[in-house]
Amino acid sequence: MKIAIGCDHIVTDTKMEVSQHLKAQGHEVIDVGTYDFTRTHYPIFGKKVGEKVASGEADLGVCICGTGVGISNAANKVPGVRTALVRDMTSALYSKEELNANVVSFGGKVAGELFIFDIVDAFIKAEYKPTEENKKLIAKINHLEAHNDNQANPHFFDEFLEKWDKGKYHD
């Protein structure tokens, strides 16, 4: 299976561990960054993971930031993406089996690596169980998506990147 993975600078080490775990399971990993601990922002990488999944380049996605909240929100803004921020096995399975989630998100400072491994494995193995009710609910969710020209704009985050390049952000 092809799995896109992305993170912000706070949890690059966790992302690399998850990436290695996925590769050891035989999955092809599409790592969209970030690749080091240089300060950056989660929306860039949530969007990139979402785009890989929505385009079909990846079957599923994994997003990780400090809490998981921001990066999951960013990924969810990509049309066709249903991201679940999970902190337990029940939520992970429910999101895939009932809501047909295609991206799972974590807080790397909230959940430990071994726990993330278990949830990612279960999420990948779980299968969507379509019912008339959940198909209708998913269709309603999909109807909420409206095209926005910024979604396809590769320069959407340039103003922030310019500030980072000038050293205006500090941890």
Swiss-Prot record:
Determine if Isomerase is one of this entry's keywords.
yes
The record ties this protein, via InterPro entries, to: LacB, RpiB_LacA_LacB, RpiB_LacA_LacB_sf
Q: Alphabetically list the UniProt keywords.
A: Isomerase, Lactose metabolism
The record's top EC class is isomerase
Spell out the reaction equation it catalyses: aldehydo-D-galactose 6-phosphate = keto-D-tagatose 6-phosphate
User: Which GO MF terms does the UniProt record name?
Assistant: galactose-6-phosphate isomerase activity; ribose-5-phosphate isomerase activity
Q: Which domain of life is it from?
A: Bacteria
Its BP terms in the Gene Ontology are: D-allose catabolic process; galactose catabolic process; lactose catabolic process via tagatose-6-phosphate; pentose-phosphate shunt, non-oxidative branch
SUPFAM superfamilies in the record: Ribose/Galactose isomerase RpiB/AlsB (SSF89623)
PANTHER family linked: DNA DAMAGE-REPAIR_TOLERATION PROTEIN DRT102 (PTHR30345:SF0), RIBOSE-5-PHOSPHATE ISOMERASE B (PTHR30345)
Name this protein carries in UniProt? Galactose-6-phosphate isomerase subunit LacB
Q: What is the lineage of its organism?
A: Bacteria, Bacillati, Bacillota, Bacilli, Bacillales
Encoding gene per record: lacB
